Amino acid sequence: MRKALNSNLLLVLLLCGYAGAQEFKGHVKLLNNLFVPYPDTLVWFTDQTLENRLEVKWDVAPWLRLEAQARNRFIYGDFVENIPNYSSLIGSSNGFVDLSFLWAEGRSFVGHTEFDRLFARVSYSRFELTLGRQRVNWGIDLVWNPNDIFNTFSYLNLEYPERPGTDAVTLKAYTGSLSYIEAVYQPNKTADSSAYGVRYRANIARTDFQVLVARMAGYYVLGGGLSSELGQFAIRSEVSYFNAQKSSEKSVLVATLSADRSMGSNSFVQLGALYNSFGSRGSHEPLSLIEPRAQSPMMLSRGKVNLFAGVNSTVATLFIPSLAILVNPADWSAAVIPSLSYSASDNLTLALTGMLFAGNRTDEYPNIGQLAYFKVQWNF
C-alpha cells in the first residue's frame, strides 16, 4: 500500500509540475500485436497496448536541473489472459528504489506505470553531479554495448527506444572541450551486488575513444571503445573483460565491431559482429517476447558469435522501409525484423513491424512463432 501511495504521489507531481517546466513532451502510442505460435499455428494470440510517456524538465536555477520521465501502459488481450503471472514480467524494477507499480489488474488486462528517469543534476564549473534514476550511457555501438554495464538492454526490445534507467550517483569532470572523467556508483541491496566504475572519454584525431575500469556483482571489469571514420564508413567498437572474483566462476570477454554508412540523404546501412566467450551452442534459455531484456553485459548474446545487418531508407519523404537481421552463425538461427513506417504528419507516425524467427528449439533464435504489430504514435 505504501509503495502504491508513494508512486501515485510521484505521478501526481509529474502531471501537475508541467505548468512550471521549461520542457514538457511525450507521446501516446497504440500497439496492436499478433502472435502466431509454432508449431501450434491454429491458436493466434492478439493483444493491445496503450502507452503514454511523459517527460518533464525543470531548470530550477542555472546550476540545478530536475528531470522526471514515466511511461504508463495499459495492456489487454490474450497474452495477459493466458500467460501465468504476466504482471510480474512487466512489473519488476531493476533499480535500488522500486519506482514501478501496477494500478490495474484483471483476468485479461493490466495497468502499469514506471519512472525510468527521476533525478537532480547539479552543475558547477567543470563538474556535473547527477543523483537518482538516470540513464548511464557508456555504450558506443548501435546494437550491442558490452561497455554499458549499468544500463544493459536488449536490441529486441524494439518499442523502448528511451531504454531503462538505473538508480545511481554520477560525477562527471570535464578535462577539456571534448574530454571528461566520469565516476558512477550504483547501489544495490548488498555491497557485493552494488556496482561502481570510472570512465575516461576523449577525442583525438577525429576519433572518440574511452577506457573504463569498474566492478559489478562478482566481477571486475576492464574495457574500452572507439568511434572513428574509415573512408565513408563510421567504425565503432567496444570490448570488455569481466574478471571473475571467484575461482568457481568463469571470466568473460565480450567484444563488438560494426561499420555504418549513410547512403546519400535517404539510406543508412549497418553491419556488425559480436563475440561473447560466455556464449554456448544449444540448450539456450527460452526466448521471451514479452519484455526482452539482457540480464547483464555478459549476456548480450547466448551464442559465442552474433552477426547483424541492417538497412533503412526514406521513400518519397514519408515512407521508411527497414530491415534488420540478427544471425548466430554456429546454428544459423536468425531473427528477421522488417518494418515499414509512414509519417502522416510532423508528430504522427504509423508503423507495421514483424519479428520472424528461424531456428530449432535449442538454437539462439528458435522458431517459437512469428510476431507482427501495428503502431500508431502521436508525439507532443
Language-model-derived ranges and their functions:
Residues F24, P62-L66, R126-L129, L178-I181, ...:
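Repeated loop/turn-to-beta-strand initiation elements of outer-membrane beta-barrel proteins
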Residues V28-L34, A68-N72, L131-R133, A183-P187, ...:
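Transmembrane beta-barrel strands of outer-membrane/channel proteins
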Residues N33-T49:
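Surface-exposed strand-loop-strand hairpins of Gram-negative outer-membrane beta-barrel proteins
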Residues W44-L50, G111-D116, S123-S125, R163-D167, ...:
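Residues that define the transmembrane beta-barrel architecture of outer-membrane proteins
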Residues R53-E55, L118-R121, T170-K172, R199-R201, ...:
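Outer-membrane beta-barrel architecture
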Residues L64-Y180, G359:
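Outer membrane beta-barrel
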Residues E229-A324:
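Detector for outer-membrane/organellar transmembrane beta-barrel domains
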Residues A309-V311, Y342, L348-T349, T353-L356, ...:
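Outer-membrane beta-barrel "beta-signal"
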